[in-house]
């Protein structure tokens, strides 16, 4: 059964493989993000127009944090104007999913494989809090795993996780550092 917000999945089973011993395999079509390292501790995804902090909260604290502490972390980055911006926030579930790709490999704080671009710093957490709260039960918030690609609802106060912060990029404000000094061609 397909869920509306999941990518189209095609199942390849024993009929195609001809081996009754093999399990079915899911093949998911995905559009890879187009990441650019901005050289200031951030990475821009030019497909989604999001800018991400290159490392996550684990790199800052060396321990997991609650959902409320994740919001405090965003506020701290905004107060410091990290990379010159004061609009850092928790990502939504779809934004968090946009970093995930089985074709990408990085490693978390324990050396386990996570499926995000290797442009992001290694040694961070394997999952992230999102800003999304559970409808009708707001003690829970959604968390996304970069190991499995699954999301789960967790208690905001009793569960410890990590957070990858993001911000929206206004199309005119962002350009790679190398392009800033180039002249545009005029006829």
Summary of predicted features, one role per range:
Residues 3-88, 162-166, 173-187:
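Extracellular adhesion/carbohydrate-recognition regions
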């Amino acid at each position: 059964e397909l869920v509306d917000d999941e990518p189209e999945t095609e199942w390849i089973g024993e009929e195609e493989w001809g081996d009754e011993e093999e399990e079915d395999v899911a093949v998911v079509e995905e559009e890879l993000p187009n990441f650019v390292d901005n050289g200031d501790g951030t990475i821009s995804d030019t497909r989604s127009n999001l800018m991400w902090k290159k490392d996550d909260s684990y790199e800052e604290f060396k321990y997991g944090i609650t959902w409320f502490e994740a919001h405090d972390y965003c506020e701290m980055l905004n107060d410091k104007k990290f990379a010159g911006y004061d609009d850092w926030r928790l990502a939504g579930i779809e934004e968090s999913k946009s970093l995930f790709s089985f074709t990408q490999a990085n490693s978390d704080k324990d050396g386990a494989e996570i499926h995000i671009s290797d442009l992001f710093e290694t040694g961070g957490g394997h999952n992230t809090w999102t800003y999304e709260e559970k409808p009708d039960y707001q003690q829970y918030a959604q968390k996304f795993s970069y190991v499995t690609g699954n999301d789960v609802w967790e208690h905001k106060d009793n569960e410890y996780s990590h957070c990858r912060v993001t911000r929206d990029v206004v199309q005119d404000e962002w350009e790679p550092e190398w392009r800033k000094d180039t002249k545009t061609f005029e006829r």
